[in-house]
């Protein structure tokens, strides 16, 4: 029997306050998150942004206990998925690959090779594909394949997205139904889906299918919810977590909450649709920030649907996905990362400091130039960082 490695890909998160700055640096150093015309600027800019944002982010993590639970939950998901797959007769071992914090993708790949795995199923824990989530993780795997001959020889099957998978849709509907039934008048409860946003340019210029998949997923979940409850609920969809000056896909979560309050909504059932684990966006942004906003807007009951975590229906759905991937047509890394639109992909190679004397000089000049601009803006109180809310 072939030994199957199931590679669960996720974002990662700082487990301690002192990890917040390095974690943010890793995010902003990813060219799929901030796209620059000159790759040499990537790391200096990542350092600058992570330095400026660390204090605010540290405060948010302190508000939820001092660190992200994402790794712990993802490892629990991996263990339960592995157990269920083995019960189904699949000789599977689960591995966790985080994009921006430990355990990194390189570590998971090293474990896969050390364990003598025969083939790999790549399962991103993002139901909906986006350049900045699944896309970036697939591209990191491509980079590792190019630089590691033994890993390159290993057969890989990818699951690109699974927003429409019955197990996922059913699990979401079941958890929503539990919260709707708690309302004073359940059939009048407003089901409010909040998804992580992405820049509008990703969708319109790069062909990112994320928004279409989110909208289609919402429709599927509401249909399943109506089947469970026997009645339909009003619902709405918005996008959260936007940063910077660029326009993101709309409507925005904070604006829709205010509009619902003005319209007289009393019972709000909030659904974190693009998150399968509890982390900073659910525990701080939704549970604290948006709960306060809803109260100010006049909404009486704010009920947040828990993230899927290790909910049995969800784990069963993940096992079904792995089984279908093994039995169905192969989707390789190139196919999984492909986009319909024209977009320039930037190399995922980590930019090395000090490759030679010339590069060291340019690194120093760039860093000094950025630092000088930063000091000038601090002194003057005006500049692009103030304009986008970083200072």
Curated annotation (Swiss-Prot):
Q: Say yes or no: keyword Repressor present.
A: no
User: What Pfam families does this protein's entry cite?
Assistant: Ferrochelatase
Asked whether the UniProt record includes Transmembrane helix among its keywords, one would answer no
Q: Which PROSITE patterns match?
A: FERROCHELATASE
EC class (word)? lyase
Task: Name the residues that bind Fe cation.
Answer: 196, 281
Could you give a GO molecular-function term held by this entry?
metal ion binding
Hey, which family's this protein in?
Belongs to the ferrochelatase family.
What does the UniProt function comment say about this protein? Catalyzes the ferrous insertion into protoporphyrin IX.
The protein here is known as Ferrochelatase
């Amino acid at each position: 029997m072939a030994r199957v490695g199931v590679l669960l890909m996720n974002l990662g998160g700082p487990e301690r306050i002192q990890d917040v700055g390095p974690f943010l640096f890793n995010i902003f150093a990813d060219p799929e998150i901030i796209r620059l015309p000159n790759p040499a600027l990537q790391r200096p800019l990542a350092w600058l942004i992570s330095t400026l944002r660390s204090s605010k982010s540290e405060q948010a993590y302190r508000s939820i206990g001092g660190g992200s639970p994402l790794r712990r939950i993802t490892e629990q998901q991996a263990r339960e998925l592995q157990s269920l797959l083995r019960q189904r007769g699949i000789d599977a071992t689960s591995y966790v690959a985080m994009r921006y914090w430990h355990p990194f993708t390189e570590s998971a790949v090293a474990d896969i090779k050390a364990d003598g795995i025969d083939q790999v199923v790549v399962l991103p824990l993002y139901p909906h594909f986006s350049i900045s989530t699944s896309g970036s993780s697939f591209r990191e795997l491509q980079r590792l394949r190019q630089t590691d001959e033994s890993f390159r020889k290993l057969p890989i099957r990818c699951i690109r997205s699974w927003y429409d998978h019955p197990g996922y849709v059913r699990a979401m509907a079941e958890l929503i139904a539990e919260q709707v039934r708690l309302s004073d008048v359940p059939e009048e409860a407003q089901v409010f889906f909040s998804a992580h946003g992405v820049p509008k340019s990703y969708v319109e210029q790069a062909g990112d299918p994320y928004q279409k998949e989110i909208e289609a997923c919402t429709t599927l979940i509401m249909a399943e919810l109506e089947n469970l409850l026997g009645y339909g609920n009003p619902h709405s969809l918005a996008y959260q977590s936007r940063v910077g000056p660029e326009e993101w896909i709309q409507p925005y979560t904070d604006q829709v909450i205010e509009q619902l309050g003005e319209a007289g909504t009393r019972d709000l059932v909030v659904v974190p649709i693009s998150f399968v684990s509890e982390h900073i966006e659910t525990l701080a942004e939704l549970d604290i920030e948006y709960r306060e906003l809803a109260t100010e807007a006049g909404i009486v009951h704010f009920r947040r649907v828990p993230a899927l975590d290790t909910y049995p229906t969800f784990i069963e759905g993940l096992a079904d996905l792995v089984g279908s991937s093994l039995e169905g047509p192969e989707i390789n890394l190139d196919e999984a990362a492909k986009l319909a639109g024209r977009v320039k992909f930037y190399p995922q190679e980590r930019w090395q400091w000090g490759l030679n004397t010339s590069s060291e000089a340019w690194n120093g000049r760039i860093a000094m130039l950025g630092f000088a601009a930063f000091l000038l803006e601090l002194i003057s109180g005006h500049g692009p960082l103030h304009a986008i809310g970083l200072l």
